[in-house]
């Protein structure tokens, strides 16, 4: 996991970004300038590659890329109105704000790499997928172990010439096979 990114590093990046790239809408520039001017807001800002799963996010685009110029969302509400976004950012300054920036060569920019963070919600999703894979592996392992133990018990019943136990264990084996189909 990446070390914490300082407020000054984030502010320096925003200033560099605004000097280097022209936003598709001037309101996007205003919002970024406002954020950079308030340490208490910058503290809660996270630059991410995608906003999937984030509760509150801002997607901004510079000229030269094919993306929406300005999108703000909070929960299930999405808007392209910069004033609504500005007011939410101003009034809820102590809530996490995830920002996705679209600009030419974003993924190869060392300045952006310095402040970019992993989306924690995407990581949770991956963890869930890994959990499902682990659960499936455990289920399969337990079934294989149980089946092997049952086959051994069937062999033991045959060796002991115990028909009642043999038939009982074979029924269990057939039930097991039906569940796996």
From Swiss-Prot:
Annotated InterPro entries: IDEAL_dom, UPF0302, UPF0302_N, UPF0302_N_sf, Virus_scaffolding_prot_C
Pfam families: IDEAL, UPF0302
Annotated disulfide bonds: none
UniProt family annotation: Belongs to the UPF0302 family.
Family annotation (NCBIfam families): PRK03636.1 (NF002965)
Protein name, entry field: UPF0302 protein lwe1947
